[in-house]
C-alpha cells in the first residue's frame, strides 16, 4: 500500500536526485573555503529534499586557482570557488575590498563584499551566476621574531600573495610570493622568516611550529572569494531550486565569515597552548604609521580604475560605509 501511495505521490519522501551539480574548489579539504563548500552542499541537498545532489571536488582535483573561473564558464565544473584576489585587475569592483582599510573580521568583510557585488553587478561577473561571496579573515603577521615596528619588518622575508606582496613592499619588508602549500617547507629551510595571512593557517598548516610570534592587529588586507555557477546550468534549473540557492546567497556569506572568525580564535588558542606562541599588538601610534604608508594604494585604485570608467569614488565610499555598518552589527 505504501508503495502505491508513494507512486501516486500521496506520501512525501526525499526525492530521487534529479539534478547533479559538480562543485570545484582549489585548497585542501580541511580549509575554510572547502568547509563552506560542504556546508552549502549539505544545505542545498536538504532544502531541495534530495532533488539536488552536489558532488564536491576540493584540492584542485577538478579545477585549480588559475583556471577556476574559465573552467566554470566552459562547463568543466558547474560551480567553482575562486580567489578573485589572485587575479589582480580581473575583478576591479571586488578589488576595493582587498585594499588596506583595516577590516576587523571576515564576517564584516564577507557581508560587505556580498552587498558591494549585489549593488554594482560587476560586468566581469556577468558570464556566471554568483552564488555567494566571502573573504578570509584579515591578514596578520606570523614570524620567527617579534614584529613590533616598521624597523622590525624592514628587509624581513615574509611570504604574501596578491595585494599582500605589494603591501609588504611598501612597508619595507622583503615579500616572497608562493602558494600557501609551499610555505611549511620554505619556513623549515629558512627561505622565508614568516607569513602574512589570516591566522587560521597557524593551525591548519601547522605554521605555529615555526612562527612563534604573531602580530595580531595590523589587519593588512583580506583575500576575496567568489562562488560562481555556469550560466547555462543555472538557467536550466527549475524555479524551486533556483529559489533555494538564491535564498542562501547572503546567508552563506555570513555563515562563512562567522565560521572562519571562530576558527581563527580556536587556532590562536591552540597555537598559544601547544607551541607557546606569543601574540603582540601594535600601539595605535605605530599602526597609524603603517597605514599612512599604505594610503597611496587607495589613491592608485581611485585613479587607475576611474580612468577605465569605473565609479571608484562611489565604490570606495560604499566600502567604507559597509565596513562601518557591519562593524557595529557584527561587533566582536
Language model region names:
Residues 11-17:
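Sec/Tat signal peptide C-region and signal peptidase I cleavage site
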